Amino acid sequence: LMDHLETHPKTGFAGSFIYGDDGAPHRTAFRFPSIAAEFEAQARFGPISQLFRNKIVARPIPDATVQVDWLAGASMMMRQSVLDQIGIFDETFFLYFEETDLCRRAAFAGWPTDYVVESRVVHIGSVSTGMKKWQRIPGFWLDSRLHYFTKNHGALYATLATLSHIAGGILWRARLLIQN
């Protein structure tokens, strides 16, 4: 990652291709969250996913180094000069959305974020939380999500994103009921 930042002086952050201890690649290159993305993430089926394909937060795993909106923080390198300019991590976030917010602030300051496929890192997920499988979304994730939307888009947008999330979930459940 350091080599990438040294050869790309206009890049603010660089992150690795990440895979699990089972060898499976993880989706760690993302678009910024949006109202449309919230709806698609919950509805998650054919026509809706197709309609919002360019809004889906988790991008397909890139096979080449590419600029992205944000990266998973499990393996990310950033320039000190960028942090001096935009500030450090917002400590209000807990485990989720902090790197999303940081990359967004960098992007608005003119510093792109690159996914560097040549840098490869094994990530053993859920060690910090002890939750391999989520039975339900934890409160700290919801708190961080709400803080992200409110901080970066305002209370009205955060409310609309939440309503969109709920509407997508209702549509998904209705689809399951009809199919069964």
Can you say where each PLM-predicted feature lies in the sequence?
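Conserved donor NDP-sugar-binding/catalytic core segment of glycosyltransferases
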Residues: L1-R31
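A short, conserved alpha-helix in the catalytic core of glycosyltransferases
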Residues: I61-D63, Q67-R120
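Short, flexible, basic/aromatic active-site loop/helix in glycosyltransferases
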Residues: P33-D69
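Structural signal for membrane-spanning alpha-helices in multi-pass inner-membrane proteins
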Residues: S16, A41, R173-L176
